[in-house]
Regions:
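Conserved N-terminal architectural modules of multi-subunit, DNA-dependent RNA polymerase core subunits
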Residues: 1-243
C-alpha cells in the first residue's frame, strides 16, 4: 500500500486540488473557457436575467438627451443565445492580449516611480507585498436606437481594454512566476529539464520541494482551507434550551 501511495504522490502533490482548481479559474492562453471568462459571460443587470454578458445604459425617461448604449463585456453570442466558439476571450490576466502570453512573467509590482517590475514570491515575502497580477477586460460600446434594440443591430462606436483589478496569484499556479511554463518562457527555452527547473527555483531562493497552493498577501502565506458546509447559503439558528 505504501508503494502505491508514494507512486500517486510522485505525479500528484498534496495540494494538487488547490492548484488545479485555481488553474481552472484563471484566464490564461490555454484556458479560453476559464471560470473567470464564464463569470464575465453571464454578467446581467436585468431582473429577468436576459442580455447576459452586456450592460444596457438608457437615458432618463424625462430627459431628451443621451444615448442608448450597449456595453459588451462577455463573448459574442449567436441568435440562439449560445457563446460563439470562435469568439475570443474578453478577460485577460497579466497582459492585455490573452492570445499572446509570450511576455507574461507572473505577478508584477508598481514601484514608487510608476514603473512595473516582475515580483517573485520571495520578494513579496521579504517586502510584505501582495503577489498579484493585473486583470484586464475588453469593453465594446455600441449605440442603439432604443432600449429594445438587439445587440447585432447596434452600431459599434468604441472598444477599449481596461484594467479592472489586481488578482492574487496562487504560488506554483499557471499565473505564477515559478510555474514551469512561465520559467521556460523567461529563460527563452523550448523546454526545461527537471534539474534545470530545480536549479532555477533555488536561484530564486525557493525550495524545489515546495508544492505551492497558497497565496502571498502582505508578505504572509495564506492558504484556503476546504470545509464541508452542512447547508450552503443558509443561516442556521438554534434555540437556547437553557432560557
Amino acid at each position: 500500500m505504501r508503494d502505491l501511495v508514494n507512486l500517486y504522490f510522485k505525479g500528484h502533490n498534496v495540494v494538487n486540488h488547490h492548484v488545479a482548481s485555481f488553474n481552472d479559474f484563471l484566464a490564461t492562453e490555454g484556458n479560453p473557457n476559464s471560470r473567470m471568462q464564464k463569470i464575465v459571460d453571464e454578467v446581467s443587470v436585468q431582473a429577468d436575467g436576459t442580455d447576459r454578458g452586456i450592460i444596457r445604459i438608457t437615458p432618463d425617461k424625462d430627459s431628451r438627451e443621451g444615448m442608448n448604449l450597449i456595453i459588451r463585456v462577455g463573448r459574442s453570442r449567436g441568435h440562439d443565445g449560445k457563446i460563439e466558439l470562435q469568439s475570443p476571450p474578453t478577460i485577460h490576466v497579466g497582459t492585455t492580449e490573452q492570445s499572446d502570453m509570450s511576455g507574461y512573467r507572473g505577478p508584477v509590482i508598481t514601484e514608487a516611480d510608476g514603473s512595473e517590475t516582475p515580483l517573485t514570491p520571495m520578494e513579496a515575502r521579504l517586502r510584505n507585498l501582495n503577489s498579484c497580477s493585473p486583470v484586464f477586460v475588453d469593453f465594446t460600446v455600441d449605440q442603439a436606437e432604443s432600449a429594445e434594440t438587439p445587440l447585432e443591430n447596434a452600431e459599434l462606436i468604441a472598444t477599449e481594454t481596461v484594467k479592472v483589478c489586481d488578482l492574487p496569484i496562487m504560488v506554483k499556479s499557471k499565473g505564477c512566476s515559478l510555474d514551469r511554463d512561465v520559467v521556460t518562457r523567461s529563460l527563452q527555452l523550448e523546454s526545461i529539464t527537471d534539474e534545470e527547473y530545480d536549479n532555477y527555483l533555488r536561484s530564486q531562493k525557493e525550495d524545489p520541494r515546495d508544492p505551492g497552493g497558497y497565496f502571498i498577501v502582505g508578505g504572509t502565506e495564506r492558504v484556503l482551507i476546504t470545509l464541508e458546509d452542512l447547508a450552503p447559503n443558509r443561516v442556521l439558528v438554534e434555540r437556547n434550551k437553557k432560557n
